[in-house]
């Protein structure tokens, strides 16, 4: 169980990291950190998994190209804005409602469903995320918190139950729309940094459901 809990911490950290990338633009300091040995080693480690390798290779390629991109931080912030802060027609809005809602508007049923899930588990997400509950950053932050909470148990049976809850969340709240979101990111993000992040998110969600199912 000790190894499982340690792995849970790693899983949560990955979801929190992905959440942070979709939550706001990277600052210059944060961008500089992505060129550090620490982060590059972390990415290399993830890339050792065959499922994640294509997305990691794309992300590393984008990071390498950022080092020679003029006004890299400003340009990457503009990419973030074009993708996630504009209109559905011209961007890849990071809300479940825009992909699986009925109205084509924000705060549709997926947002209400997510609010109910958060209330049911009595879990608070990052208070800096002042967005509808079905924003991808909120859903990923919540998932990380859900994983960490499961580490509080000392019973194998309870841990298995928590795995089933996590698997259901990924399959019903993420994999129902993240594939469509990923396609839009690739259609719009010509530079490719955020497109590679969305690919990594999708690949990791699929990989994680296999792990949770015991495959």
From Swiss-Prot:
<keyword id="KW-0143">Chaperone</keyword>
<comment type="similarity">
    <text>Belongs to the TorD/DmsD family. TorD subfamily.</text>
</comment>
<dbReference type="GO" id="GO:0051259">
    <property type="term" value="P:protein complex oligomerization"/>
</dbReference>
<dbReference type="GO" id="GO:0006457">
    <property type="term" value="P:protein folding"/>
</dbReference>
<dbReference type="InterPro" id="IPR036386">
    <property type="entry name" value="HscB_C_sf"/>
</dbReference>
<protein>
    <recommendedName>
        <fullName>Chaperone protein TorD</fullName>
    </recommendedName>
</protein>
<keyword id="KW-0963">Cytoplasm</keyword>
<dbReference type="InterPro" id="IPR023069">
    <property type="entry name" value="Chaperone_TorD"/>
</dbReference>
<dbReference type="Pfam" id="PF02613">
    <property type="entry name" value="Nitrate_red_del"/>
</dbReference>
<dbReference type="InterPro" id="IPR036411">
    <property type="entry name" value="TorD-like_sf"/>
</dbReference>
<comment type="function">
    <text>Involved in the biogenesis of TorA. Acts on TorA before the insertion of the molybdenum cofactor and, as a result, probably favors a conformation of the apoenzyme that is competent for acquiring the cofactor.</text>
</comment>
<dbReference type="InterPro" id="IPR050289">
    <property type="entry name" value="TorD/DmsD_chaperones"/>
</dbReference>
<dbReference type="GO" id="GO:0005737">
    <property type="term" value="C:cytoplasm"/>
</dbReference>
<dbReference type="InterPro" id="IPR020945">
    <property type="entry name" value="DMSO/NO3_reduct_chaperone"/>
</dbReference>
């Amino acid at each position: 169980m000790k190894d499982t809990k340690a792995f849970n911490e790693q899983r949560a950290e990955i979801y929190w990291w992905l959440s942070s990338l979709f939550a706001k633009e990277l600052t210059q300091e944060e961008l500089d950190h992505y060129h550090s040995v620490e982060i590059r080693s972390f990415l290399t480690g993830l890339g050792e998994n065959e499922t994640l390798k294509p997305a990691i290779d794309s992300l590393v390629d984008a990071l390498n190209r950022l080092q020679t991109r003029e006004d890299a931080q400003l340009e990457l912030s503009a990419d973030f804005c074009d993708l996630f802060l504009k209109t559905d027609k011209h961007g890849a809005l990071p809300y479940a409602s825009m992909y699986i809602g009925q109205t084509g508007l924000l705060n549709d049923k997926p947002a209400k469903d997510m609010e109910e899930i958060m209330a049911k588990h009595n879990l608070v997400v990052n208070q800096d995320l002042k967005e509808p509950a079905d924003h991808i950053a909120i859903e990923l932050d919540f998932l990380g918190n859900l994983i960490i909470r499961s580490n509080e148990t000392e019973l194998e049976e309870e841990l298995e139950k928590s795995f089933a809850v996590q698997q259901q969340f990924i399959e019903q709240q993420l994999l129902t729309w993240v594939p469509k979101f990923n396609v839009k990111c690739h259609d719009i993000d010509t530079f490719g940094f955020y497109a590679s992040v969305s690919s990594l998110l999708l690949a990791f969600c699929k990989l994680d459901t296999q792990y949770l199912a015991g495959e």
